Amino acid sequence: MISRIFCAIAAIFIAGSAAASDVRRVVTGLDARNHAVVLFDSSIPLKQDSPVLSSTNFWITDSTPPSLSMQDTANRPIGVSPPENGTKFRLVEFAPLDPATEAKLPPEMIMKGVTHPPQRGIPVKHPMMHRTRSLDYAVVLSGEIDMMLDDTSVHLKQGDVIVQQATNHGWVNHGTQPCRILFVLMDSKEP
């Protein structure tokens, strides 16, 4: 129930800005008197990472527990994995991928910025397959997408929630509309 409410609020907030491809990010903190204030309030553009996806980082931490430094920690290269002992809060927009284009994807196109390619010894069934050494929480905000795993695929729609535990996976949008997914990635130990 709570996850559905979160999904609905997040979908209204983020999917509503889909036309502009920018997302408003509001970050709060404390001033010198320990009063809650707005530190950052601005539009964050999605950056095209590849022909099939765009993304942006909202916030990144470099330690657990995180430092509340009041500095903008998201202003760094996008990449996929969170920093060691850190977290990454990000939005990814997957463009529709028609079968003809999908068939032409080069096998070496492991997603840009992935520090952990698929598990060794397991054949890669799609160029978008990859792995992050992280525990990931994800919410499909808009659109539909197929999450590929080693031996199966799962079709996901708006409002679906994913908990991914450092597994091989890939994302392919076989629909006609972009799919936006909100991710929180937390660094983990190797499984």
Features from the language model and the residues they span:
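N-terminal signal peptide c-region/cleavage motif recognized by signal peptidases
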Residues: 15-16
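N-terminal leader/capping segments at the start of a protein or of a new domain
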Residues: 19-71
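Bacterial N-terminal signal peptides that target proteins for export
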Residues: 1-7
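Ligand-binding loop in jelly-roll beta-barrel domains
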Residues: 144-146, 153-157, 166-190
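A short beta-strand-loop-beta hairpin characteristic of the jelly-roll/cupin
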Residues: 123-126, 130-132, 137-158
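Double-stranded beta-helix
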Residues: 26, 30-31, 35-42, 48, ...
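Conserved short histidine dyad/triad with adjacent acidic residue
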Residues: 43-45, 90-132, 165-168, 187-189
